């Protein structure tokens, strides 16, 4: 496992003791002007081709390939980060269930600094694995692990926050957990399927939840301060959260979506909100399919998505992770056009048309 930055490589061992990782996260918070400005940063394992065993519930066996790319975009400093882990249990020294890997992917979009995003990236996967109910009650484990990671970050007294979106794949099961405005989109036979909901103050359901907990929305911002209604961190902001009280208007609890993958499911795209500022769900699926049909390289596809977002005027940090469920490129899809009527001409009509054309 590594952390890579284009300006000087930093390495992090995910197998290090939890205490050491916690000590490393307790450094003094820096102002945005003091933070480095790497062009690209990622935490990733080599996930070129991790094969899954035959799943007893069906014939489809996902063949997992993942790629990733990040760019600082138009910002002065980089607050996005992400993680890709082929085998979550093995990565932390645990035995996989039935020797079947659980792969883990996460995108974390920090605000007010990068400390919260890096803390959650480094600690959330470990917290999930160390839960007593992992992996048998995965939904329950993931939900409370988000909250636990949030509470652990509060102890660092660092002043920043982060949105978080994770994807876990176990056999044919895909579990998405989201707190914030990163987004996951699935391509199913070329059709974009939204796998997460953006948690923003403009969302009616989120606005009602916030108001029921004593918060308010002012000019599109939570309590006039934040552009998201769910995030980890931000403990320094008054009126958002309170230690020991899970009922604040800013929630770290994720919304979950779980599905069973089929052969029609081609790939999953996870992106920070900078991607979705300039791409619609269907647009990014169409773009990715065309690129994969050209070269079938998942990492190059992520780079091209990020570069295209910059060309379209994206100004935020940009992160894209693509997880393909097949070794082959997506097939061409024939688009049906409703309302088109097939028409033919008789032999007599064809002769009349020829005569008419000759006489002109």
From Swiss-Prot:
PPM-type phosphatase domain segment(s): 65-325
InterPro entries (alphabetical): PP2C, PP2C_BS, PPM-type-like_dom_sf, PPM-type_phosphatase-like_dom
Key word Metal-binding present: yes
A GO biological-process term: signal transduction
Cofactor stoichiometry and binding remark: Binds 2 magnesium or manganese ions per subunit.
Gene Ontology MF terms in the entry: metal ion binding; protein serine/threonine phosphatase activity
Reactions that this protein is recorded to catalyse: O-phospho-L-seryl-[protein] + H2O = L-seryl-[protein] + phosphate; O-phospho-L-threonyl-[protein] + H2O = L-threonyl-[protein] + phosphate
PROSITE patterns: PPM_1, PPM_2
Cofactor annotation: Mg(2+); Mn(2+)
Binding site for Mn(2+) 1: 109-110
SMART domains documented for this protein: PP2C_SIG (SM00331), PP2Cc (SM00332)
Pfam families noted in UniProt: PP2C
UniProt similarity note: Belongs to the PP2C family.
PANTHER family: PROTEIN PHOSPHATASE 2C, PROTEIN PHOSPHATASE 2C 54-RELATED
Protein name in UniProt: Probable protein phosphatase 2C 54
Species of provenance: Oryza sativa subsp. japonica (Rice)
């Amino acid at each position: 496992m590594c952390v890579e930055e284009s300006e000087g490589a930093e390495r992090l061992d995910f197998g290090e003791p939890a205490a050491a990782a916690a000590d490393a996260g307790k450094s003094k918070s820096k102002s945005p002007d003091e933070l480095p400005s790497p062009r690209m940063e990622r935490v990733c394992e080599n996930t070129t081709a991790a094969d899954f065993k035959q799943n007893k519930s069906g014939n489809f066996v996902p063949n997992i390939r993942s790629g990733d790319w990040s760019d600082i975009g138009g910002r002065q400093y980089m607050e996005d980060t992400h993680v890709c882990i082929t085998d979550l249990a093995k990565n932390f020294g645990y035995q996989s269930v039935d020797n079947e890997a659980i792969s883990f992917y996460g995108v974390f979009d920090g605000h007010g600094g990068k400390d919260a995003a890096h803390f959650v990236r480094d600690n959330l996967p470990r917290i999930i694995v160390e839960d007593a109910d992992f992996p048998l009650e995965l939904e329950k484990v993931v939900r409370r692990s988000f909250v636990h990671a949030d509470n652990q970050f509060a102890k660092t007294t660092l002043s920043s926050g982060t949105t978080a979106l994770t994807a876990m794949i176990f056999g044919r099961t895909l579990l998405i957990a989201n707190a914030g405005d990163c987004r996951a989109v699935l391509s199913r036979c070329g059709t974009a399927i939204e796998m997460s909901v953006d948690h923003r103050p403009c969302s009616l359901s989120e606005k009602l939840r916030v108001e029921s907990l004593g918060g308010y929305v002012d000019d599109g911002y939570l309590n006039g301060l934040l552009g998201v209604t769910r995030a980890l961190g931000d403990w320094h902001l008054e009126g958002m959260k309170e230690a020991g009280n899970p009922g604040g208007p800013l929630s770290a609890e994720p919304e979950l979506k779980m599905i069973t993958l089929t052969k029609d499911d081609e790939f999953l795209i996870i992106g920070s909100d900078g991607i979705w500022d300039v791409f619609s769900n269907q647009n990014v699926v169409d773009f990715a399919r065309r690129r994969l049909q050209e070269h079938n390289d998942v990492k190059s596809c992520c780079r091209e998505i990020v570069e295209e977002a910059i060309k379209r005027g994206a100004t935020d940090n940009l992160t894209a992770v693509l997880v393909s469920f097949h070794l082959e490129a997506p097939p061409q899809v024939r688009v049906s056009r409703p309302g088109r009527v097939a028409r033919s001409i008789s032999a007599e009509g064809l002769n009349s048309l020829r005569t008419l054309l000759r006489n002109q």
